[in-house]
Amino acid sequence: MSTNRRRFLQQLGGLAAGFGVVSTGLAACGGNEPSSDTTKADSVSTPAATAAGKLFFEISLAQWSLHKPLWEKKLDNLDFPLVAKRDYGISVVEYVNQFFKDKAKDEKYLAELLKRCNDNGVKNHLIMCDGEGSLGSPNDKERLQAVENHYKWVDAAKYLGCVTIRVNAHGEGSREDVQKAAIDGLGRLGEYGAKAGINVIVENHGGYTSDGAWLAAVMKGVNKPNVGTLPDFGNFCIKRDGKGMFDGKCVEEYDRYKGTQELMPYAKGVSAKAYDFDAQGNCIETDYNKMLKIVKDAGFTGYIGIEFEGDKLSPEEGIKKTKALLERVGAIV
């Protein structure tokens, strides 16, 4: 995770933003039925061909891969679908609410975004939601406010034709207290999401959530067909030596392969995190052969989202290298 994103999450982690219902009158690209099979991807995902040489999954593009040009105003959120399709040949996108955080209830804006999606033949898959409070807070008032803060993103996802929102399950307290609170918070949000046909999924994203066994236990506790996980290949740092969840060097890291394996039974999406590559085009920090085998063995046939986050390569080059790696390894595992 980049410094900018860490700062953003710290600044917005406790904000209460209220909620409201967005009209769904405009036809959306993509369906909205929540998944009823927690061992697979979203029920509306179109499985990729599994014949020899073909991928067992489909590739999507996580908007965070382009966070640098987005923060620098070199790229506008409304142009993301076009860029994904034109520059990278990717027809499925994953948004980050940070790049249109004040537009969740702006129907005119959402309509324009959806129009650009449809004009370019791009499908909206999910919205990653940060800065809307702690769904795992042991404080009842804080947790319930966080649940309500996410309602508007469920509504926006419905409008845009997404099937999923990605949330965080952070909270301050003991492992047991935060786990109990997260089960309650996610369960409540999951109920709201189910009414709209939207899945609610949690990423391993720092703190207790980067402990695969802990997050898997939360999923078992929630026990709802539309509440699941978004395993991220690289976000398994549980503790850092700086202040806050995302500052400083990682001093306690969960095994990424073990964690991914534990989270895959509940996965409704996967994030292919990459930072750097060797001369052969392999990801340096993650063995993609090993990781994609774990994903495949879990029976997953949905979307694997490219999330390049490195500093040595440009976002454009990093996205292309991650895509090439997924295509090469995905065809042979």
PLM segments and residue spans:
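Aromatic/hydrophobic pocket-lining residues that form the small-molecule binding cavity
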Residues: 77, 110, 146-150, 179-182, ...
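Short, acidic/polar
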Residues: 71-86, 144-155, 252-260
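Structural motif corresponding to the early beta-alpha repeats
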Residues: 86-187, 194-199, 225, 235-243, ...
